[in-house]
Amino acid sequence: MVLNWRFALSADEQRLVREIISAATEFDEVSPVGEQVLRELGYDRTEHLLVTDSRPYAPIIGYLNLSSPRDAGVAMAELVVHPRERRRGVGAAMVRAALAKTGGRNRFWAHGTLASARATASVLGLVPVRELVQMQRSLRTIPDPMVPDQLGVWVRTYVGTVDDAELLRVNNAAFAGHPEQGGWTATQLAERRSEPWFDPAGLFLAFGDSSSNQPGKLLGFHWTKVHAAHPGLGEVYVLGVDPSAQGRGLGQMLTSIGIASLAQRLVGPSAEPTVMLYVESDNVAAARTYERLGFTTYSVDTAYALARIDD
């Protein structure tokens, strides 16, 4: 096999990589990469590793995306091997190549923590360093949304770029130091707004009301998402509360409002309406809040790294 690092992919290479990701998703019933990797295929902000057979004009059989470290973090890699090309060492070869490029200082996401990923990690001396839990619940029967004014806030939906500065402020304060969600820029927000699934009516903003000590200030938000490729599936995409307003129940209130909105949009005869979300496995308080709202664990994504990396 031949491994080639690229700073950018051609349009044809992007198409072929997407086809491999689609084939793996259908085969494993879980996407091998996160949405950010799909977003980065058309840019040169990350590094791309392509694997082909050694014969001329051979098709791409494996792909790895390597993102640069953010702040004091480490580089993150996500990879996929075409289902027809597995058990040939392709995945292990890509992992070794990424470790060689970063001096061993990167992590690897294993979405769904499949048996094959666990086996490869064990052989290469990688250990779990982070777990992201996907939780789900049915939208058939949901509790009534909480009343905002009982918490000293009023809620409206996103009206446009006039909201962006405050949205970024709260997001970056709520997720300070978070490897994916923290440190967003206006460009990153605009990219997500340009996604086909974006619906301003599904982005809820909570402001301090006249009775609060922070009138008119954005205190939290709940960004919901409808998965067009999966009928009936919605997501608590981002839920952020300003640290100055935490501990008041705003997160639970915003969650209940967003879930009620998703239920209205998704309940129908064609599919079982479901809402999903992600939570860090060590965020016990958040997990308990979601459990009280009826969520249960659906799957776990695991980040692996060499045993010596514990930061």
Swiss-Prot record:
InterPro entries linked: Acyl_CoA_acyltransferase, GNAT_dom, MshD_Acetyltransferase, Mycothiol_AcTrfase
* Reactions catalysed, as given in the entry: 1D-myo-inositol 2-(L-cysteinylamino)-2-deoxy-alpha-D-glucopyranoside + acetyl-CoA = mycothiol + CoA + H(+)
Q: Where does acetyl-CoA 1 bind?
A: L79, V80, V81
Which terms are listed as keywords in the entry? Acyltransferase, Repeat, Transferase
Name of this chain's protein? Mycothiol acetyltransferase
Q: What class of enzyme is it?
A: transferase
Q: Which residues form the N-acetyltransferase domain?
A: 155-311
- Report the EC number(s), separated by commas if there are several: 2.3.1.189
Q: Any idea which positions bind 1D-myo-inositol 2-(L-cysteinylamino)-2-deoxy-alpha-D-glucopyranoside?
A: E35, E180, K225, E235, Y278
Name the positions where acetyl-CoA 2 binds.
Answer: 239-241, 246-252, 283-288
Q: Does the keyword Repeat apply?
A: yes
Q: What HAMAP family does UniProt report for this protein, alphabetically?
A: MshD (MF_01698)
- Gene (UniProt): mshD
Keyword flag NAD: no
> Partners and quaternary state?
Monomer.
Q: Name the job this protein performs.
A: Catalyzes the transfer of acetyl from acetyl-CoA to desacetylmycothiol (Cys-GlcN-Ins) to form mycothiol.
